[in-house]
Structures are given as structure tokens and as C-alpha cells.
């Protein structure tokens, strides 16, 4: 009877994972699917609560309890000061769920991983087919009108290269990293994930892949240098050429985008740092006003999403969050998971791909797939 209950529970958890990931991947084509992501993901976490392994870290649970009470008090104060209860509850649940999701050690995560790989291949195919069609025709107007009208994202051409920046692509860098670390080599699936991330054309995705390659191969390169390995005769020139080409292309793209994108980020730094640096302005704090480039009244997503969290809970809250999510990885003998998570934090810092459902998916994948 116990075995039957366990099987049913695991199957049910996998079913909610499937619906949540399907909604996440394909919300760009049917916006109503977005409403299923959080409820299904929350149900999955509840069903996996018996697989949460945090008791081995003595300092973790007291720190999490402190974080829980800190967010509760911050949320109450913010609500009293007129902040939206919906926004407050949203960030309250997300900030509490991410560290818990990181503690899920599902021994049978293979099923969830296979489901995700299938969904990701389907999504990658649609992105790449769109990219190819736009590249051949050199016309993106119809696609862009669709993306803008439905809230699916944006599709355009920059320097002759299409950018298919639609919802659901921000997880592809993490999928590439997890597949590479899991298989210890570049597989066809891993390459497909990386190519799809590059097809999206977001500079953050490029940064994520580049940072991972540097973190992973940096120590290997140092060992080769110490041992005076002959492979360096071929590796160093190739690396120099690749870095030069990458740098030239990045600088060229940045010149085109800098006038608007970087100006918006600078403006957001000014807006989001106008807060109490220690405790913030309160959980769910509604940013008001704006600047030359944009109005921010009621916004909950920013290019600098990390700074928005800082705006709400200050250094104490943000610092505690980072400790909670770094401790479990830092205390492991192998630091591969820590490297992958730091890579995620780096490439999402300047973009709105953290502190949301993507962040929860990322830590679940890093914890259960990276070996």
C-alpha cells in the first residue's frame, strides 16, 4: 500500500511538473497558460516536500526562519504603507519558495528531466524555425506585430541577424549547462539548447554561456599551462580568435543597443536605489514615478530585477537570500552546482530572469541534474 501511494504521489508530482513546464514553455503562444505556471509549480513543491533535505545544514534552518520573519514583518509594514497586497504576496511566496526548491533532492527526477527535454526540443524547434524564416526573408514585421500584440515578447533583426526574444527562452541557458554537466560532454541536446539561446539573441544568454565556458574550462586551461601541454599550441590560437570574434560582434551589437537599453538601466539604477539601503522600502513596494525613458508606476518587472528586490528588502534581506541559496552548494565537496548557480546569478543580474518561476526551475534543475 505504501509503495502504491508513493508511486501515485510521484506520478502526480510529475504530472504537475509537466503542466507547469508546458505552460512556461508555450505561454508565448497562448497567454492564458501563464496562469497555470505558479499553481502547478507550487503543488509540485508541496508533493516533493518529503524530499527536501536541509536538516544536514545546522545553520540553514535558523537562517531560513529569520528570513521568513523578516519578510513577514517587511510585508506587513509595506501593506500598512499602501503597497498592493497582491504584489506583496507574490514576492513573499517567491522569495520563500526559491530556497526551499533548492533543497528538493528528488531521487526519481529522471522522469521530470525527460519530460522537460521533450518540451524544450519542441519549443527550440519553433524558435529556430522562426529564426530561419526571418533570416531568409529578412523581414520580421509580421512576427513582431504578433509578438507585441499578444505580449509574447519581441522579434526583430539587428545587424542582419534575427532576435527571437519570446517568453520561455530564458531557461535554455540553464538547460544547456545542466545537460553539459550531467553528461560531462557536449551532446546534441546540449548544443540545441545553446544554439536556441543564441538564436534568441539576448545578450544575457550570451553572457551566461560565455561565463559558464570560462568557469568550466578556466581551471583546465591553467592545468595545461602548468604542465606545458602541447595541446595549447592549437587551443590558445583558436581561443584567441574565438574571443576576438565574440568581442568584436558584442561591441558592435552593444553600440546599436546602448543608446536605449543601457540608458534605461542607468535610469533604473537611480530609481531603484532610492530606498533604505539596510531594510528596503518594504516587500512588494510599488515603485512610483519615472524618468526620461520610462514610467515605472506599478511595474514589477525591471531590466535590473535584482535591484528591485534590493529596493524592497534592502541589504539584510537580499544578503540573507543569497546566503540561503549559496550555503547548500558551497558546503558540498564538489563545487559544480555552486559554479552553475553563480553563472545563473551573473547572467540574470542585469535582466528580469530571476526572482520568479524561472529562478525556481533553475535551482530545481541545478540541484537534481548537475552531478
Region locations from a protein language model:
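Long extracytoplasmic/lumenal interhelical loops at the membrane interface
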Residues: 252-313
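Hydrophobic transmembrane helix bundles of membrane-integrated enzymes that assemble
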Residues: 2-253, 298-371
